Amino acid sequence: MKLSRRSFMKANAVAAAAAAAGLSVPGVARAVVGQQEAIKWDKAPCRFCGTGCGVLVGTQQGRVVACQGDPDAPVNRGLNCIKGYFLPKIMYGKDRLTQPMLRMKDGSYHKDGEFTPVSWEQAFDVMEEKFKTSLKEKGPEAIGMFGSGQWTIWEGYAAAKLFKAGFRSNNIDPNARHCMASAVVGFMRTFGMDEPMGCYDDIEQADAFVLWGSNMAEMHPILWSRITNRRLSDPNVKVAVLSTFQHRSFELADNGIVFTPQSDLVILNYIANYIIQNNAVNQDFFTKHVNLRKGATDIGYGLRPTHPLEKAAKNPGSDASEPMSFDEYKAFVAEYTLDKTAEMTGVPKDQLEQLAQLYADPNKRVISYWTMGFNQHTRGVWANNLVYNLHLLTGKISQPGCGPFSLTGQPSACGTAREVGTFSHRLPADMVVTNEKHRDICEKHWQIPAGTIPAKVGLHAVAQDRALKDGKLNVYWVMCNNNMQAGPNINEDRMPGWRDPRNFIIVSDPYPTVSALSADLILPTAMWVEKEGAYGNAERRTQFWRQQIKAPGEAKSDLWQLVQFSRRFKTEEVWPEALLAQKPELRGKTLYDVLFATPAVSKFPLSELKEDQLNDESRELGFYLQKGLFEEYAWFGRGHGHDLAPFDDYHNARGLRWPVVEGKETQWRYSEGNDPYVKAGEGYKFYGKPDGKAVIFALPFEPAAESPDNEYDLWLSTGRVLEHWHTGSMTRRVLELHRAFPEAVVFIHPLDAKARDLRRGDKVKVSSRRGEVISIVETRGRNRPPQGLVYMPFFDAAQLVNNLTLDATDPLSKETDFKKCAVKLAKV
């Protein structure tokens, strides 16, 4: 086969990415231009992380047979990470589910029965009976849903609409609660609006990069390649990496900092103190655009109210704050001296000063990146607020190459979980259920009776587990996630709750995951390009793709499942008489009629599409469902700083970053000349706040919920590895990725291993106060913990690491701290 220069470069990019992971390259990736005449190519965003890389998908005879980086995609510019190159294989695991499976005994449903194939009609019959019984006997608070940052935009929107407007239950929450909730609350507290103000274009213009609890080399490798290129192209560019253990991102670091768990709060306040003491505050920016507030402290750990830590907290769950002066703030951070910070964090003084100087230097453009190290933290919201403080003190924000940037881990944690409003407290476009005006806006736009949407915040992820255990939540639908493996403290609440005979659990999934096998009913689900979809990535880029192949067997998209199930309920069965009296014309109609077949949603005909562009749902319903849902949803944000472009624009583009006003996307929000919502002469305007000013919060160090002691003498931190994504339900079914990292290990310092008579490769029992797992000792390799800490990835279903973790959460965001609990090791 003769290759062009461009194809040759592409093939070598694939080989380089594979070599970095120690893998062989699949033939479909290696043969970049082979048999192009027989393969149909179309664009799609990658199925994995929140970077939002663009890929070209090659289909042939109804299957995905090839994949390559999209050279026209601005995010990745033709390059994929190793997971991206193996995308063609994620849908073809030998155990792919192709028909509904119900636990049955003697021909009918039984909690302890064996999984038995049933039709969709039978599956929905059982679901309908369980939903209607719970709604009739206990009301909307007895049903719930756990969704996903992997839902497409219209799937998340349909789910939120069905539960909040249809079933009148706010007990819907996404798995983004476990990864991005602290970022959401941090953004809302400081700026009054969610999501980053900058974009990936900052990378090529920055002078310094600071990673806070983020191993971008493995978790966001395409962005890391751009940072690496920037660092190696200019000797004046600096990289600082902060973590509780060394990892691959340290290889590029000019200043690699390992700190004691939880003490990142101390470092952040020290830097603020350094900026003030060295007269590095941007006084003009600060005076015009910033307010100061002192936050409530001693706020607890999001545990059950009966837990001793919650009983001891003075202000459990409080997000209160009060105004303070600059002198008061200066005095507050003055306590975080260099000596005190070095002592509390274990970080050498020269490294701390070097880090602080990056932020304080007025001539250095600095980007702060963070992911789970900040967010999965019992003070994760505070950590987010404190890093914003540094950028607001110095004015290094909302300009090219400058700004704080929260990275996401799922492909649409931003576009779906956050923007659509699938959290238990949120509605579309940053609106919330507790705000009467916001509820009224939604009810009028959806043309449903006033008062339909409950004002009470629903159950968040961990609260759902507890309610299942307590028998208060009785019907639970889990979609597009594997929470039985991914969620914290499996044995305490979740597993007992799922297997409680009072409860009925539905899991929609393509594979028999730990969650699916723990359920009562499994619904087979279409994946990725087996459906038409849309994701929103970490830089506010909304990206669309067409359905390119059909799902196997009877597998159906999450959207199909939600919409078709809504047909089973008439308004009289879910709404009280007082609501129906407001709109008697809705009597006798199904939730499908009221929510999904409305004139607003169903007005786009199939004639807008070519035959080969039709998707299964629209073909079945007779109208362009996805376009109708998107346009209805997009209305909420237009004119309010969340503007999305018209639907058709996205199919013709490689994504657009909102707000999109008059056809132009926005790279940098809140700054004049970049953001259409900032008028000439305003300079900066943080328009999420009534006065247009961002907030600096004074927040102290507070200890972790659980720390090592004489018995459980090691910190445990959990996370991911390059080759696998989350629980491995897709990547472990790709033979090459599985071979590259076949089982989880315990990364441990050699001296800690020696003290316990452990050697590399030994089997070891890892125990916490909540459970235990058997794993393998690893004293070398990519992750190098300090003494006193071990690190374990959670992708391995044979090693349920979350048997060990504590379900302590940030009291403000309700996000779990997966990075800090106490364990002990014993040789097996």
Curated annotation (Swiss-Prot):
Any one Gene Ontology BP term: Mo-molybdopterin cofactor biosynthetic process
GO terms for cellular component: membrane; nitrate reductase complex; periplasmic space
EC number: 1.9.6.1
Annotated InterPro entries: Asp_de-COase-like_dom_sf (IPR009010), CT_Nitrate-R-NapA-like (IPR041957), MoPterin_dinucl-bd_dom (IPR006657), Mopterin_OxRdtase (IPR006656), Mopterin_OxRdtase_4Fe-4S_dom (IPR006963), MopterinOxRdtase_cofactor_BS (IPR027467), Periplasm_NO3_reductase_lsu (IPR010051), Prok_molybdopt-oxidoreductase (IPR050123)
Gene Ontology molecular function, alphabetical: 4 iron, 4 sulfur cluster binding; electron transfer activity; iron ion binding; molybdenum ion binding; molybdopterin cofactor binding; nitrate reductase (cytochrome) activity
SUPFAM superfamilies for this protein: ADC-like, Formate dehydrogenase/DMSO reductase, domains 1-3
Record-annotated 4Fe-4S Mo/W bis-MGD-type domain positions: 39-95
Domain of life where this protein originates: Bacteria
SMART domains reported in the protein's UniProt record: Molybdop_Fe4S4
Record: residues binding Mo-bis(molybdopterin guanine dinucleotide): 83, 150, 175, 179, 212-219, 243-247, 262-264, 372, 376, 482, 508-509, 531, 558, 718-727, 802, 819
Keywords carried by this UniProt record: 4Fe-4S, Electron transport, Iron, Iron-sulfur, Metal-binding, Molybdenum, Nitrate assimilation, Oxidoreductase, Periplasm, Signal, Transport
Chief location bin: periplasm
Principal EC category: oxidoreductase
Role this protein plays: Catalytic subunit of the periplasmic nitrate reductase complex NapAB. Receives electrons from NapB and catalyzes the reduction of nitrate to nitrite.
Family statement drawn from the similarity comment of this UniProt entry: Belongs to the prokaryotic molybdopterin-containing oxidoreductase family. NasA/NapA/NarB subfamily.
Protein name, UniProt field: Periplasmic nitrate reductase
Species in which this protein is naturally found: Salmonella paratyphi C (strain RKS4594)
GN (gene name): napA
